[in-house]
């Protein structure tokens, strides 16, 4: 499915992908990740980028419920993406968060939730609504009642975006904030 945006991000086309389509575009996706997270704000080191390319993304492609949105600019270049999958106990992120939050929060939020693993927008496309378009397009394609994600501290550029979409913090530790959104609750 493909949508042209009628907002400042209108120079981009959003497309929804399943695991096979995402795997076919892996080279472009990985280049976009490298470009997005090598900027001055994020400054992800080479080791972290290599881990994403060689281990994390290939592993995530195989997770149940994997779904992705990608954005291509008018030149056809992939300039952003967002993806997630069904989070379960026994997976790294779910277990990492579960060990750091109150058991009642764990029971309420984790296991069977849709987990947003990455939202990446290349620097030249930031501030135009593309991150919002990628995330909302992905969420609109999902039916899970709970969505969870983690971002850097509250001063992360993405934090206000998540809050504006109805995500609320339910964990705050190790320089990260864990946010969740119940789909049966309207977003702001």
Say what each PLM segment does.
Residues 2-54, 68-78, 86, 188:
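Short amphipathic alpha-helix that is part of the acyltransferase structural core
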Residues 107-109, 114-133, 154-160:
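Conserved glycine-rich acetyl-CoA-binding loop
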């Amino acid at each position: 499915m493909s949508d042209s945006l009628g907002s400042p991000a209108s120079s981009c086309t959003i497309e929804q992908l399943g695991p096979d389509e995402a795997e076919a575009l892996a080279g472009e996706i990985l280049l976009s990740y490298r470009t997005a997270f090598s900027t001055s704000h994020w400054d992800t080191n080479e080791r972290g980028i290599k881990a994403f390319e060689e281990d994390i993304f290939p592993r995530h492609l195989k997770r149940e419920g994997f779904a992705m949105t990608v954005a291509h600019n008018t030149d056809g270049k992939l300039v952003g993406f967002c993806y997630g999958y069904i989070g379960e106990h026994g997976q790294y992120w779910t277990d990492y968060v579960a060990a750091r939050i109150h058991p009642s929060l764990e029971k309420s939020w984790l296991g069977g939730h849709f987990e947003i693993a990455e939202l990446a927008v290349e620097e030249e496309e930031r501030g135009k609504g593309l991150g919002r378009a990628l995330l909302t397009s992905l969420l609109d394609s999902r039916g899970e009642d709970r969505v969870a994600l983690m971002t850097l501290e509250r001063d992360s550029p993405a934090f206000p975006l998540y809050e504006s979409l109805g995500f609320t913090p339910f964990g705050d530790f190790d320089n990260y904030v864990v946010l969740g959104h119940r789909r049966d609750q309207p977003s702001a």
